[in-house]
Structures are given as C-alpha cells and as structure tokens.
Amino acid sequence: LTTDAMEAIETCQVIVELVGGTTFAKTIILEALKRGKPVVTANKALLAKYGEELFAEAEKSGADIFYEASVGGGIPIIKSLREGLVGNRINRIYGILNGTCNYILTRMERDQADFKEVLADAQKLGYAEANPSLDIDGFDTAHKATIAASLAYGKWFGMDPVYVEGITEITLDEIKLTKELGYKIKLLAIIKQNDGNVEIRVHPTLIPKQSMLAKVDDVFNAVMVNGDFVGDTLFYGRGAGRNATASAVVADITDVCLNLNAGSSRRLPGFVAGNLYDQVLPIDNVRSRYYLSLQVADEPGVLAKITNILASYNISISSVVQKERKGGENVSLVILTHLCEEKDMKAAIVRINALEEVRNNVKFIRIEDL
C-alpha cells in the first residue's frame, strides 16, 4: 500500500480513480494514460469537462478509460450504449439521473409538502448534501447527460452548450395542477438527434403520468433509450450510493482485465469517435410543447388578448384551464400549447407579461410526450 498516487501509477497494472474533483484527478488519469495504464473512474464532472482531452490521450497511448459509474451508478447504461446498442442509431435518450431531485419531487407530490421542507428532510436522511446546489440546480444531471450524449453520438460536446435548469422554482401548486392535467414533473435529461444537430438539455419537464418514467420515484434513476432498430429500452435502478457505485466500478475493472487478457488487437475501447452530428442545438431553437401558468384579472377579453399574442408567434393552444376564483379579483389560468420554438415562446411571454391584466410573470415548463 502507498499514499503516493504517482508511485501507484508506476507500479499498478490498473488505475482506479475515485478521488473526485477535476484537478488532481485529471493529473492522475493523464499520467496513467501516458504510461499506457488502463483507467477506471466514476468522475462525471471530470469526463464532462475534459473527456475529449482524456480520450485523445487514451487513443494516443492505446490505453482504456472505463467509466460506468459516472452515469446512473449501478445502472449499466454506459456498457449498454457502448456494446449492447451499438447496432443502433440512437434517436433519443431520456434520463432521470439525480436521486436527490427525484426524491424531492416525489415527496412534494406524495406528502403535499413544499420544496424547502422536503429538501431539509433529504439533507437529514443523507439524500442531499449540506450544499445541494450541484444536484438541485441540475448540474449533476447535466454532467451525466453530456457523457451519455457524447458516447451515443461519438463526439465530446463538453458542458458549455448544454442547457441546464434546476428544480428550485417548482412549487407545490404546480405539482398539484399538472397532476390534475395528467402529468408529473421530473428533472429530465433530454438527448435527441435533430436534423444534423443534437439536443442536450436538462430541466424540469412535464411527462404523462402513465409513462414508464413517471413511475420512477424516490431516489431511483432510470434511462430510456430509443434506437432505430431496437425501439424503446428502459434501464432502472439505484443511481448513487456506495454499493451501486462499487458494482459499476468492479464491472469496469473486470472489463479492463478482459481487455488485458485479450490483447490490444481485440480490446473493446471505452469510446469510439464518430462525429455524426455537428453541434448542440441552442435552447432557443428547440421545439417543444409548453405548460404556462399565470394569474390574470377576472375580466372579459383577457384570454382573447393572450391567445392573440400566442397566435402572432404561430403558437397554437392545446387546452386552457381556468381555475375557479376563490375570493379576490384574480383567477389562475393554465395553458398547454402545441409544438413551437422556444424563442417564439419567450418572445410571446414578454408581451403577455406586459399586459395590464396579467398579475404575475408567466411561468412555463416544457412538456415531453413520451
């Protein structure tokens, strides 16, 4: 045994990096790869940020990087994308990839509790960190989404073009309203091919409550992958925790040993470059359906003004729900739209917010009809 990482790199056949962070961990991995040593890592933040550099070094030296534990913990999604689904062109991936967020949203719905109350409980139970921002602001999920997208499409996209939005603005009222409309709110990683480009985005999303992903509750994770031959596949399990991580790490070590025994000519690489798609589509150019909620004056003609604004941006309405007024002069209005570009929706919302009869800024949540 040694406490010197460089000594371990020199003497060990396989390097397992579990120290975390993006500085010292990067040094360890690069030094190991330069010496032709295979690496196993669970470091999602490092791979999301420096994956292109690390795998370029691995290709140069003929070494391998295995990283099953970086996405989905004990769910074998990396191996499935790399091997089991290799005969498919991946059309889309939907993922519930953060147990903390999924636990919070599940408890808010089940116990009719607000966000801050459930977050405090999650911290007491060890499901959330003392500083939970990486989880609840969506960046943990975004790291995982970037890795999965890069593997699926053969190009390291990095974090910069990925749209990230967390769950901190989700209210109990919205969870109740969307449930009445037949939806559940999940923090969803969305990866899609789109006319030569790729969508990689993370945000709260309304999904039909009868869908398989809507039934994934508490700290569990799930990934739905659609391939052109296989259709929809679903991977479900524990996405974090020492046992789930250990399971994935040991599986990677086993694959490394198989590669070492097979020899370099028959090894299975950890990443194969394909460059099938050019770039990540900006969020403003993404087409989606939307849920809009707002408070308006209980006066004739208000809805007509709102629908006229939406129509001027070619946004058509799927349904409108007006909640019964309980005292006061305002009513709650919920609008579901058909597909439209996000830039058009944002422009329409600016004009709707400027109406004298609108009492609060419009809140919107994207919808995915899985």
Regions found by a protein language model. Give the residues of each.
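A short hydrophobic/small-residue beta-strand
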Residues: 38-40, 317
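Rossmann-like NAD(P)H-binding beta-loop-alpha module
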Residues: 59-140, 147
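Rossmann-fold NAD(P)-binding glycine/threonine-rich loop
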Residues: 19-35, 42-83
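A conserved regulatory-domain signal marking ACT and ACT-like small-molecule sensing domains
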Residues: 248, 253-370
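A structured beta-alpha segment of the ubiquitous adenosine-cofactor-binding alpha/beta core
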Residues: 1-24
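Conserved active-site and cofactor/substrate-binding residues in soluble primary-metabolism enzymes
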Residues: 3, 49, 72, 76, ...
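Substrate-binding/catalytic subdomain of NAD(P)-dependent oxidoreductase enzymes
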Residues: 117-215, 220-222
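Catalytic, metal-anchored helix/loop core of enzyme active sites in primary metabolism
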Residues: 92-94, 102-105, 121, 126-131, ...
